[in-house]
Amino acid sequence: MKNPLRKRIPRELKGELGKYLVVFLLMVLTIGFVSGFLVADGSMLKAYNESFDKYNIENGNFRTAEKIYSSQWKGIEAAGVKLYENYYIEEDLDNGSTMRFFKNREKVNKVCLMKGEMPSGQGEIAIDRMYADNNSLKVGDTLIRGEKSWKITGLVALSDYSALFQNNNDSMFDSVKFGVAIVAPEEFENLDQEKLRYNYAWIYDHQPKNEKEEKKVSENLMEDIGKVVALETFVPRYLNQAIIFTGDDMGGDRAMVITLLYIVIVIMAFVFGITISNTIRKEAGVIGTLRASGYTRRELILHYMTLPVLVTLAGALIGNILGYTVFKGVCADMYYGSYSLPTYVTVWNADAFLLTTVVPVIIMILIDHAVLRYRLQLSPLKLLRRDFSGKKQKRAVYLSPKIGIFSRFRLRVIFQNVSSYLVLFVGVIFANLLLFFGMLLPSTLDHYQMEIQENMLAKYQYILSVPASAYSGNKEDAMNSLLEYYTDIRTDNKDAEKFSAYSLNTMPGKYKSEEIAFYGVEPDSRYIQADLSGDGVYISSAYADKFRIKEGDTITLKEKYEKDEYSFKVDGIYDYAASLCVFMERDKLNEAFDLGDDYFGGYFSDTEIKDIPSKYIGSVIDLEALTKISRQLDVSMGDMMGMMYGFSVIIFLVVIYLLSKVIIEKNAQSISMTKILGYTNGEISRLYILSTSLVVVFCLLLSLPVERQIMEVLFREMMLSSISGWITMWVDPMIYVKMTAIGIAAYAVVAVLEFRRIRHVPMDEALKNVE
C-alpha cells in the first residue's frame, strides 16, 4: 500500500519553496565550484604529468661559453644522453620586462600553441600566454625594443617553462616582468648575436627510476661533460624550478576546497535541522495524530528527511553538471593565471563525484536524522498537547520589571531562539572567515612589500656563481676557470662588502624541506648590525616566525642531498622579513663548512656593481627580486579573492535569511495576536526584526576576534605548504570596519524581506492552535 505521507511532500515543497530554493541554489554554487575545481585540478595535473612524454621535456640543460663542435658533441652523447641545441637570447623590452627568445623547438621541449599561429618569418613572434595576459597583450599586438619591433602571431606554452623562472636560483617565478617567446630561425639570426647563450638540452638514453638515482646519474654526467667542454651552468630536471615547481604546487589547494564544501554542507544541514524542528512544532498536532494512529517514529523521520536529502541530491547532481561545464573553465583559468600550462582534456574524476555528491548526502542524512530523532522522542500525547518541554518543565529566565516592556519582549524572543542564533553565529563566522581571507591577503602583501623596502640588508646583494667548468673532470681547464673567476670577481666599488654564502636545508617533516641561506659577514659589517662574536648564530625574523624559533633554541639543518647534519644555537633574531637565513661571522662560516680562509660568495652594496662580468653573477637580490613573491601571489590569487568576496556575502545572506524566516514563522501566532491588539507592522518589526538585528550585530562583533585566531592558523598552514620563504600575516584595522559594514549592509537586505513577511502574517493565525 502506498504511503499517504508521500502526498504531503509536494505540498510541503510548495509551502516552503523560498527556503528550499535558496538552499538549493547555495548547494549548486558550492558543489559546482568544488566539483569544477577538482575536475580542473585532476585534468590539468594529468596533462602536466603526460606533458613530459608528449612534449619530450628535457632531462636537464647546460650552458657553455662557446658552441659545441661535432667531436665534442659525440663525446658528450657517448655518456648516455641525446643532445639538442636550445640556444636563447635575452632582450630588455620597452615595457620594462625581459624576453627570452628561442627558435621553434621540434624535437625536445616542444611548444603548445594556445592561440593564433606560430611565427613563420621575420618580425613575427609567439609569446608565452601567461606573460601576455599579465601584460595585457594579445595576438596582433606589437612588442617593441628601441627601433626593433615584433608582431605577436600567437600565444604559446613552452613545456620547459610551466613556471616562468628567469633564474633557477630565484625564490619565486615572475610572469609579469619575465617572458619566453618563439621566433622563426631567420628572425633569431637577426637578434643581437652577442647576447647568444649556448644552451643545450639532454635526454637520457635510459631514464633514472627516481630522484635519488637521477641525482647520481646527473652528477656523473656533469663530470663527463666537464671533461669535454667548459660548463657555465648545469641544471638537471629535478633541480629545474621552471619545470618542477608547477607539479609540486598543483594539488595543494585540494584539501582547502574540500573543507570549504563540507563546512557549507554542515551549516546547511543544521539550518535544515532547525527548520525541521520548527516544522515539527507547527505540525505537532498532525504528528501526534499520526503517531497515535500507528505511524512509527522511523516512518516520520524518513518522511521529514526526504525533502532535505532530495534538495541536497538535486543540488549535488546539478552542481556536478555545472562543475564539468561552467565552473571547470573558471577553475582552470585560475591555474592558467598562475602557470604557463599547455592545453588539457577534461577527464572523469570519480573522487570529485564521491566527494561532492555521496559525502554531502551522507552528512545531511546523519545530521538531520540526529535532529529528528531527538525532536520526535516526545510521546503522541505531548505532541497533541503541543507540550515540547521534554522531561522537565523549563523555567523562563527572570527579567526585571524595571526593564521596559519592549526590551523584555525582545529578550524573550532571543532566549526562545537561542539554538537558531547559535547556528547563525557559526554561519556568520564562516562567511566572515571567507571575507576576511579575501581582504587579508592583498593588505598583507602590500605590508610585506613595505616592510621589505624598509628592512633590506643592502640595496643590492650580488650572489656570485662559480662556473660549472671549475668542477669539470678536466683538471687543467678547471684550474684555469677558477683562476679566471677569482681574478674577475674583484670590484673597485667602495660600497661593496664581501660575505660568504652557503645553504642548507631544514630537516624533512610534515612540510617540504626548505632551503636556508647562510650569510658569513665581516665582524665590523656596515650592513648587518648584529653581535656575531658569540659561538651561536643569528637568524632572520622570517625564519624565526615560520618555524617558531626563539632565542636560545638550537636549530638542526642538513645538506640538501647528503646525510650530513649541522646544529647551531640561536644567539639572537635579526629583523629581516625577506628571507629565511642565518647570520654568522665570515671566518666562522668558512671554517664550519670547510670553504677555505679567503672564500667569499657575494657582495653587499648600496650602489650597483658594474665591473664584475655578468657570467659570474648568479643572482642579484634587490627590491624587485625580494618583492617577486608578493607580486606573483597578487597576480595568481587576484581572481580567487574576488570569488571569496562574493561567496562569503552569499553564504551570509542565505544563513541569515533562513534563520530569520524560521524565527518569524515560529512566532507567527504571537505576531498575529499583537496585530489583533492593535500594534502596527512597524512596532512588531521593532520586537522581532530588531531582536535579530541586535543578535546579528553582536555576532558580527564577537566573530572578529574568533576569526582572527582561526585565520592565524589557516594563514600559517597556507604559507607553510604553498610557498618557499615566509610572509607574516598582517591585519589592516580597516578590514574589521569593512567586514562589519558589509555584514550590516547584507543584513539590511534580509531585514527588508522579513518586514514584508511580518506584513503578510494574517490576524486569524492567532485563532489557530488555541490552547
Q: Model-derived features: where do they sit?
A:
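Membrane transport/envelope proteins' first extracytoplasmic loop
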Residues: 2-269, 278, 332, 337, ...
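Hydrophobic alpha-helical transmembrane segments of multi-pass inner-membrane transport and secretion
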Residues: 15-44, 248-288, 306-323, 354-366, ...
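Short coil/turn motifs that cap or connect alpha-helices
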Residues: 138, 296-297, 379, 550, ...
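Short, membrane-interfacial amphipathic segments enriched in basic
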Residues: 1-7, 392-408
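Short cytosolic juxtamembrane segments of multi-pass membrane proteins
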Residues: 3, 376-394, 756-771
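Short helix-loop junctions at transmembrane helix boundaries
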Residues: 317-354, 698-765
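Juxtamembrane segments of multi-pass membrane proteins
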Residues: 62, 405-546, 550-553, 558
